[in-house]
Curated annotation (Swiss-Prot):
Residues 88-440 are annotated as: Disordered. The modification Arginine amide is found at residue 456. This is Chromogranin-A. Sulfated on tyrosine residues and/or contains sulfated glycans. Pfam families: Granin. GO terms for cellular component: chromaffin granule; extracellular region; extracellular space; neuronal dense core vesicle; perinuclear region of cytoplasm; secretory granule; transport vesicle. GO terms for biological process: adenylate cyclase-activating adrenergic receptor signaling pathway; defense response to bacterium; defense response to fungus; defense response to Gram-negative bacterium; defense response to Gram-positive bacterium; innate immune response; killing of cells of another organism; mast cell activation. It comes from Homo sapiens (Human). Belongs to the chromogranin/secretogranin protein family. Glycans are attached at residues 181, 183, 251, 424. Residues 182-191 have a biased composition (Polar residues).
Amino acid sequence: MRSAAVLALLLCAGQVTALPVNSPMNKGDTEVMKCIVEVISDTLSKPSPMPVSQECFETLRGDERILSILRHQNLLKELQDLALQGAKERAHQQKKHSGFEDELSEVLENQSSQAELKEAVEEPSSKDVMEKREDSKEAEKSGEATDGARPQALPEPMQESKAEGNNQAPGEEEEEEEEATNTHPPASLPSQKYPGPQAEGDSEGLSQGLVDREKGLSAEPGWQAKREEEEEEEEEAEAGEEAVPEEEGPTVVLNPHPSLGYKEIRKGESRSEALAVDGAGKPGAEEAQDPEGKGEQEHSQQKEEEEEMAVVPQGLFRGGKSGELEQEEERLSKEWEDSKRWSKMDQLAKELTAEKRLEGQEEEEDNRDSSMKLSFRARAYGFRGPGPQLRRGWRPSSREDSLEAGLPLQVRGYPEEKKEEEGSANRRPEDQELESLSAIEAELEKVAHQLQALRRG
């Protein structure tokens, strides 16, 4: 009996354990599973979609497990995006490094090629310099030989040069001489070390042309007077430039290359013109002489002129760097103009300050004088005031005393008012002058600031 009872109890217990217990947690899970099934069926049935109910949406949104799963998926997507970005950036940096290396290699190759080209160019340039030196020596020798052989055939070229000098206009000769002197640089520049054969040939041709022109000009007395006047004007201009003070010409020191060659040319021209004046002053004597005597005189004159002018080409016309000289001259002229402007500005400022000081002193003196006069008058009135009172005390009933006491005060009051009006009228133009001076000073300061900015720029 007992065994049967135990078996019955065991069977009952097994049945009880096999039956499901409907707990609230199980109900929620079942609802979530149903909603998931609906969503899956909706996604699978795309041609004919089956819509998900609103209750399923709410249950899925409220379930934390589904939210965590979705967040996890989003994190995975973000990590994938970051990984892709990192890979792209690495590839870009590698490309940059490779491009930079390529550029460096190209630059190094270019530098090496340029160095090779420079070496290849310097070798023939040194050869050219040596050849130019040899050519210049040969040209000097040939020039000396031609100078020695030239006096034999002088009379005919002299006549031709005279005819050409008479035919040429004075204005054209002036222009040609100025061009000849301006186009050739001075000999004192350090950069022009080696004279070329072309420069020496040009110098010889120029000396011959100057000699011929001066001889042609010797036949024109009016032209000689013009030349003398021009020389006097040039000397006056040079003297004025030398007399400029150091304050106005600070940039004169900046010129390290004085044009000595030009001065030598001017000396040669003055001597040749003096010779030409002597020749023109004695036309009758030359006509009276024989043609042989004329030829000898002209021969001696030409020798002297050639000896004087031979000194000039050796120092002048070295190199062909007229462009650099022109640039230096332009720069120096600009600096000279700037210095003149600054000196003028300084002078104007000094004058304005001196005028202001004088005006201030005059105003102070006027104020002192007026204050002294007023104090003196006040004292005078103070001392004279008791007079009528005493008189009134002595004779109070007299009418004449009262009139005498009242008149001076009234009469003396009028000139004071007149003087004050005159002082105010005089002060008005003074105030206007001060205002105009202050405006001029402000404009000068603005101009000075602009010049400083331009210099710094």
